[in-house]
């Protein structure tokens, strides 16, 4: 009877997480998830650093453009949808967690991110580069079942990143000032299991759903006989995209652990690592 009740709770958690995800309106820079179970007892804290590298294809849709010639409005129109290929993002976070209830944990992260992509807007070997910009995230973890060497649970997290930088190309003989600003909010919902493999090593993984929304704003100045300035804006809105993740947790010392992790979806690959202390 107890086993049946635990299984029912697992299915209810999965259904609740999916329902929350489908109802989210602002939901890309995939973030590290870690084990999908609560790691902290009630009242405990954790703190540490996280690093994530992600590579993905980013669809830009519903584009709009405004063109100005010699400082005066010239015209506007619809811009075709495009795909930013191999959009690479590096993030570095300071993360803090807290055991809010038994088997429930909340966490926040704050740090910096930078991103690059190339040859996707004009196919003229142009590249986007930026300095590190602000990134923030938060989430919840819950443990639903504990038995033998197994734990089963779920995770919900949201990350927001804003990137701005210049676009340039070695093929442009005349300087063409171009700037882009990318703002994305991504949401991940996962269920999964954690297995204690040895006294110090655990493995974890499972399926997850991913959602993304945001904007891609682009401004250029074309230096010809006239002085043209263009302002382009696209929307980013994808999901749910389904994928899987696999990771390992290593107990380095008492109350100190490290995680390494890989995530994969149809259009993204993610590698992550962290080191956390529990207090």
Say what each PLM segment does.
Residues 1-41:
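Cleavable N-terminal export/targeting peptides
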Residues 47-53, 108-112, 154-160, 205-211, ...:
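Transmembrane beta-barrel strands of outer-membrane/channel proteins
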Residues 25-69:
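Outer-membrane beta-barrel biogenesis signature
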Residues 83-109, 116, 182, 194, ...:
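Outer-membrane beta-barrel transmembrane strands
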Residues 86, 238-240, 259-274:
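Solvent-exposed loop/turn segments connecting transmembrane beta-strands
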Residues 49, 94-98, 138-142, 158, ...:
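Residues on the lipid-exposed face of transmembrane beta-strands in outer-membrane beta-barrel proteins
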Residues 55-89, 110-135, 158-186, 213-224, ...:
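Extracellular/periplasm-exposed beta-strand and loop segments of Gram-negative cell-envelope proteins
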Residues 103-106, 147-152, 200-203, 250-260:
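Repeated loop/turn-to-beta-strand initiation elements of outer-membrane beta-barrel proteins
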């Amino acid at each position: 009877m107890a086993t049946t009740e635990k299984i029912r709770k697992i299915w209810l958690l999965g259904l609740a997480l999916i329902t929350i995800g489908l109802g989210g309106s602002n939901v890309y820079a995939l973030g590290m998830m870690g084990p999908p179970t609560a790691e902290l007892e009630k009242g405990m804290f954790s703190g540490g650093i996280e690093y994530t590298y992600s590579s993905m294809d980013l669809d830009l849709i519903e584009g709009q453009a405004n063109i100005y010639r010699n400082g005066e409005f010239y015209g506007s129109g619809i811009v075709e949808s495009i795909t930013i290929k191999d959009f690479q993002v590096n993030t570095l976070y300071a993360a803090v967690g807290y055991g809010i209830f038994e088997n429930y944990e909340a966490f926040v992260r704050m740090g910096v991110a930078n991103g690059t992509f190339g040859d996707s807007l004009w196919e003229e070997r142009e590249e986007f580069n930026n300095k590190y910009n602000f990134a923030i995230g938060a989430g919840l973890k819950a443990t639903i079942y504990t038995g033998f060497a197994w734990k089963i649970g779920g995770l919900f997290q949201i990350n927001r990143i804003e990137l701005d930088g210049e676009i340039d190309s070695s093929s442009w003989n005349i300087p063409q000032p171009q700037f882009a600003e990318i703002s994305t909010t991504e949401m991940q919902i996962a269920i999964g299991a954690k297995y204690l493999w040895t006294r110090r090593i655990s493995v974890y993984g499972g399926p997850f759903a991913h959602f993304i929304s945001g904007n891609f704003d682009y401004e250029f100045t074309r230096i010809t006989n006239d002085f043209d300035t263009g302002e382009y804006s696209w929307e980013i809105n994808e999901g749910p995209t389904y994928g899987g993740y696999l990771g390992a947790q290593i107990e380095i010392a008492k109350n100190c652990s490290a995680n390494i992790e890989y995530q994969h979806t149809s259009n993204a690959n993610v590698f992550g690592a962290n080191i956390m202390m529990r207090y």
